[in-house]
C-alpha cells in the first residue's frame, strides 16, 4: 500500500521514514510545501468573500421583490441556501484548518465539516437536477394539461433535501465514514480504504451511481429534450428574427448549464472513483484536493449561471444594489420585450 492508514484517517504517503503523523494532531507539512496550505486558506477566503454576498443577495432580493417569489424560482432559492451551507459549513472550516496545516478540530469537527460540506454540495447537485426537470416539464409539456404550481415546487425542494440527506447522513451512522482528505484540511467520504465494519465499497458504488450517474443522465436528457423543443419552434418560425435570436440565446444557456454541471462534478467524481478502484496506488495529496476545488467553486459560478443570467433576477438585483434604480433598464427592457415576442420565450427555459 502506497499510503498510511490509521484510526479514522488515511495519509497518501508510505511511512517508511516514520514522519507520518495523525492529521488530527500534527501539521502535515511533510505532504506538501507549507506555502500550499497558505494558498488553500487564501482560496477558501476568496470563496467566502465572493460566495456569501452573491448567494445572500439572491435570498434578499427575492424577499424584497414579490414578482420573484414564484414556484419556478423556489429551487433557485434552495440552490442559494445550499451554497451558503457550503460557505459556512465547509469553506470557513477549511480556511481555519489550513492556517494550522492539519485538521485541528479533531474527529468530531471532521464529522461536522464533512456532513455540512456534503449536505450543501448534494443539495446543490439535486437542485440542478430538479431545475432541469422543471424546465423540461414547463417547456416540453410531456404531461398534457399539467400546470406547475407551488405544491410541485415545494415537493421539488423537499426531494433535494431528502436525497442530500441520503448521502450525507450514512457516514455518520456507520455506512462509510468521514475522514480528512487531500491535504488533510477538509473532510469527505472515505474513498481510500476498505476499513472493517464501514462497508466503504458499497457506499462508494451507491454514491457513484445514485448521486452522480443518475443526476448526470437526467440533466442530459432534460436539457437535450429542451433544446430539441426550442429548435423545433425556431424552425417553424424561420422568418421570425426574434424567435431565431431566442433560440440561440436558449441554446447558449443550456450549453453553459450542462458545462457548469460537468465542471463541478465530473472531476471530483472521476478522481474519487479512480482512488476507490485503485486503492493502494500511489497518488499525491493534490490529486484529490484540486478536483474538490472545482466542486467548491460551484458556490460562485452556480449563482452566476442560474441566477444572474436570468433577466428578471438580474434586473431586480441591479435595482436593489443601485438603491431602486436600474441604469441599464432601457437595455434590459428592450431585450426582455424582444424575447417575449417569440413563441418559445427564453425566460421559460433560462436558468430561472
Curated annotation (Swiss-Prot):
Residues 331-352 are annotated as: Disordered. GO terms for molecular function: 11-cis retinal binding; G protein-coupled photoreceptor activity. Residues 62-73, 134-152, 225-252, 309-352 are cytoplasmic. It is a multi-pass membrane protein. CDD domains: 7tmA_MWS_opsin. The chain crosses the membrane at residues 37-61, 74-96, 111-133, 153-173, 203-224, 253-274, 287-308. InterPro entries: GPCR_opsins, GPCR_Rhodpsn, GPCR_Rhodpsn_7TM, Opsin, Retinal_BS, Rhodopsin, Rhodopsin_N. Residues 342-352 have a biased composition (Low complexity). The record marks 113 as: Plays an important role in the conformation switch to the active conformation. Its main location: membrane. GO terms for biological process: absorption of visible light; G protein-coupled opsin signaling pathway; visual perception. Phosphorylated on some or all of the serine and threonine residues present in the C-terminal region. Contains one covalently linked retinal chromophore. GO terms for cellular component: membrane; photoreceptor disc membrane; plasma membrane. The modification N6-(retinylidene)lysine is found at residue 296. Residues 1-36, 97-110, 174-202, 275-286 are extracellular. Keywords: Cell projection, Chromophore, Disulfide bond, G-protein coupled receptor, Glycoprotein, Lipoprotein, Membrane, Palmitate, Phosphoprotein, Photoreceptor protein, Receptor, Retinal protein, Sensory transduction, Transducer, Transmembrane, Transmembrane helix, Vision. Glycans are attached at residues 2, 15, 200. A lipid is attached at residues 322-323 (S-palmitoyl cysteine). A motif ('Ionic lock' involved in activated form stabilization) lies at residues 134-136. This is Rhodopsin. It comes from Zosterisessor ophiocephalus.
Amino acid at each position: 500500500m502506497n499510503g498510511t492508514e490509521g484510526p479514522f484517517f488515511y495519509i497518501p504517503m508510505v511511512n517508511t521514514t516514520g514522519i507520518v503523523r495523525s492529521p488530527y494532531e500534527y501539521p502535515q507539512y511533510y505532504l506538501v510545501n507549507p506555502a500550499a496550505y497558505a494558498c488553500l486558506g487564501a482560496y477558501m477566503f476568496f470563496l467566502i468573500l465572493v460566495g456569501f454576498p452573491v448567494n445572500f443577495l439572491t435570498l434578499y432580493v427575492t424577499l424584497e421583490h414579490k414578482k420573484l417569489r414564484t414556484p419556478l424560482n423556489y429551487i433557485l432559492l434552495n440552490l442559494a441556501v445550499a451554497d451558503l451551507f457550503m460557505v459556512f459549513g465547509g469553506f470557513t472550516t477549511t480556511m481555519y484548518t489550513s492556517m494550522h496545516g492539519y485538521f485541528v478540530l479533531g474527529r468530531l469537527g471532521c464529522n461536522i465539516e464533512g456532513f455540512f460540506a456534503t449536505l450543501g454540495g448534494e443539495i446543490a447537485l439535486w437542485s440542478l437536477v430538479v431545475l432541469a426537470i422543471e424546465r423540461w416539464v414547463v417547456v416540453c409539456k410531456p404531461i398534457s394539461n399539467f400546470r406547475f404550481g407551488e405544491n410541485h415546487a415545494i415537493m421539488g425542494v423537499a426531494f433535494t433535501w431528502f436525497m442530500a440527506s441520503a448521502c450525507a447522513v450514512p457516514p455518520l451512522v456507520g455506512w462509510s465514514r468521514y475522514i480528512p482528505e487531500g491535504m488533510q484540511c477538509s473532510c469527505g467520504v472515505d474513498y481510500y480504504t476498505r476499513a472493517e465494519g464501514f462497508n466503504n465499497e458499497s457506499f462508494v458504488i451507491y454514491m457513484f451511481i445514485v448521486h452522480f450517474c443518475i443526476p448526470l443522465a437526467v440533466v442530459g436528457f432534460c436539457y437535450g429534450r429542451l433544446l430539441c423543443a426550442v429548435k423545433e419552434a425556431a424552425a417553424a418560425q424561420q422568418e421570425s428574427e426574434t424567435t431565431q435570436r431566442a433560440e440561440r440565446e436558449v441554446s447558449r444557456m443550456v450549453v453553459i448549464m450542462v458545462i457548469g454541471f460537468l465542471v463541478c462534478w465530473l472531476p471530483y467524481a472521476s478522481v474519487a472513483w479512480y482512488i476507490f478502484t485503485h486503492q493502494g496506488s500511489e497518488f499525491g495529496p493534490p490529486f484529490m484536493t484540486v478536483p474538490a476545488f472545482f466542486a467548491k467553486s460551484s458556490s460562485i459560478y452556480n449563482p452566476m449561471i442560474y441566477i444572474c443570467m436570468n433577466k428578471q433576477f438580474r434586473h431586480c438585483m441591479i435595482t436593489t444594489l443601485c438603491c431602486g434604480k436600474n441604469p441599464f433598464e432601457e437595455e434590459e427592457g428592450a431585450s426582455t420585450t424582444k424575447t417575449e415576442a417569440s413563441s418559445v420565450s427564453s425566460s421559460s427555459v433560462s436558468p430561472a
